[in-house]
Amino acid sequence: MGVSGVLGAVGLLMVLQAAAVQAAEMAPPYAVPLGSDGVQRATITLESYSYTPNHVIVEAGKPVELTLTSVTTITPHNFIIKELSVEQDVSAGKTVVVKFTPVRTGTFPIYCDKRLWPMPSHRDKGMEGTFEVK
């Protein structure tokens, strides 16, 4: 494959990535249900440069358990809600569980700050969302 073929493939990947990010941004917010044990549980999928769902709503003062599943094969990600002191690395193809109890109400950004220098961070590529505590 020549240089023009490589550039064409890179361009196609960038268009597909932008379409995936746009689709994730249009998804409705997900209100996490309260289990019979009083725990709010949700699964969040970490894709190439997006979270699904990317807008999660929980109740303050009740435990939250998030199952974070990376469906990428090479790229590691993380899940950060800085204002709530939540930061979890997720290796490519792995699943981890994060447990915490939010006490502050508000709307907080979720993002991945991983990057391969000199490329933009995953957040700069659209890997961000919203964590809402009511």
Each PLM stretch: what is its role?
Residues 48, 69-71, 102:
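Non-cytosolic beta-sheet module surface loops
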Residues 54-55, 76-81, 110:
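Short, hydrophobic/aromatic beta-strand segments
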Residues 1-43, 133:
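Extracytoplasmic entry segments of secretory-pathway proteins
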Residues 32-63:
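N-terminal edge beta-strand
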Residues 65-67, 99:
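Residues within well-ordered beta-strands of beta-sheet-rich folds
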Residues 26-36, 90-134:
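Extracellular/periplasmic metallocenter environments
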Residues 53-56, 85-89, 98-99:
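Beta-strand-rich interaction surfaces with strong enrichment in secreted/lumenal proteins
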Residues 64, 75-77, 106:
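Short beta-strand/loop motifs in extracellular/secreted proteins, especially
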